[in-house]
Amino acid sequence: MENFQKVEKIGEGTYGVVYKAKNKLTGEVVALKKIRLDTETEGVPSTAIREISLLKELNHPNIVKLLDVIHTENKLYLVFELLHQDLKKFMDASAVTGIPLPLIKSYLFQLLQGLAFCHSHRVLHRDLKPQNLLINAEGSIKLADFGLARAFGVPVRTYTHEVVTLWYRAPEILLGCKYYSTAVDIWSLGCIFAEMVTRRALFPGDSEIDQLFRIFRTLGTPDEVVWPGVTSMPDYKPSFPKWARQDFSKVVPPLDEDGRSLLSQMLHYDPNKRISAKAALAHPFFQDVTKPVPHLRL
């Protein structure tokens, strides 16, 4: 750790404080994440160290690079490449004008490329949200915190007791499914896609049941026809109200037919029928994809 000089605190992640720091030997400016674990007394679990070490092998232009893992007396620091801003802050700054469609398309395409790469290596994210999608001035967007959920679990609250958001959580997780797949990340990205387009969260729930009911009110309450096996999931209740599905033209009015078609496939209830990242990249929506540069107010 003595090789790094903390410059400033840049945020608070799910697992601990994030600092902008400088490598004293190379002059490289990085993001330094201090991981706070409940097990600080016993030290860092060896399983977590193993999981994290594997992530150093995940090299892709749309994945935030894990440069180093520093494990010193019961503390764990992760050294990542540093990017300008996260998508949440960018969306907030673009709230009045909105993000131009070519940029939304470019971002979604890049994120799907990052997901396809990780999923092909059997690595899930499990906690995708605008806060862990990072952008730079060149028009790139990258997925951050990949694989951390498997190493450390997804807590209910962050280390500062903030509630971890449910807005992007897939229905199979909310219904208590223990064995989930890469499809959970596609669901999250679908929610983020809709949010970029409409400038507001698609399903901003404030509890697990509110989250589920918001999904049901938009996509219709799922049954065995649309989602075989749903009625036998641990947290499914036959008493759930039966809502009808809304037309997607009302859910995401600015989107054209191709965009709505892709979104509906990303938000398919049945995880087995939900589109994969690889298949999504071939969708007609991306026929005219380009790589525009964002107007960043830094």
UniProtKB/Swiss-Prot annotation:
One of the GO BP terms on file: cell division
InterPro entries: CDK, Kinase-like_dom_sf, Prot_kinase_dom, Protein_kinase_ATP_BS, Ser/Thr_kinase_AS
Sequence positions bearing Phosphotyrosine: 15, 19
PROSITE patterns per record: PROTEIN_KINASE_ATP, PROTEIN_KINASE_DOM, PROTEIN_KINASE_ST
EC number: 2.7.11.22
Modified residues (N-acetylmethionine): 1
Superkingdom per UniProt: Eukaryota
Protein kinase domain residues: 4-286
Protein residues bound to ATP: 10-18, 33, 81-83, 86, 129-132, 145
Residues with Phosphothreonine modification: 14, 160
Cellular component terms (Gene Ontology): Cajal body; centrosome; cyclin-dependent protein kinase holoenzyme complex; endosome
Names of the cofactor(s): Mg(2+)
CDD domains: STKc_CDK2_3
Catalysed reactions listed for this entry: L-seryl-[protein] + ATP = O-phospho-L-seryl-[protein] + ADP + H(+); L-threonyl-[protein] + ATP = O-phospho-L-threonyl-[protein] + ADP + H(+)
Site feature CDK7 binding, where: 9, 88-89, 166
Keyword Magnesium: yes
Residues modified as N6-acetyllysine: 6
Any one GO molecular-function label of the UniProt entry: metal ion binding
Enzyme class: transferase
Activity modulation notes: Phosphorylation at Thr-14 or Tyr-15 inactivates the enzyme, while phosphorylation at Thr-160 activates it. Stimulated by MYC. Inactivated by CDKN1A (p21).
Family: Belongs to the protein kinase superfamily. CMGC Ser/Thr protein kinase family. CDC2/CDKX subfamily.
Subunit structure: Found in a complex with CABLES1, CCNA1 and CCNE1. Interacts with CABLES1. Interacts with UHRF2. Part of a complex consisting of UHRF2, CDK2 and CCNE1. Interacts with the Speedy/Ringo proteins SPDYA and SPDYC. Interaction with SPDYA promotes kinase activation via a conformation change that alleviates obstruction of the substrate-binding cleft by the T-loop. Found in a complex with both SPDYA and CDKN1B/KIP1. Binds to RB1 and CDK7.
Protein name stated in the entry: Cyclin-dependent kinase 2
Species the sequence originates in: Mesocricetus auratus
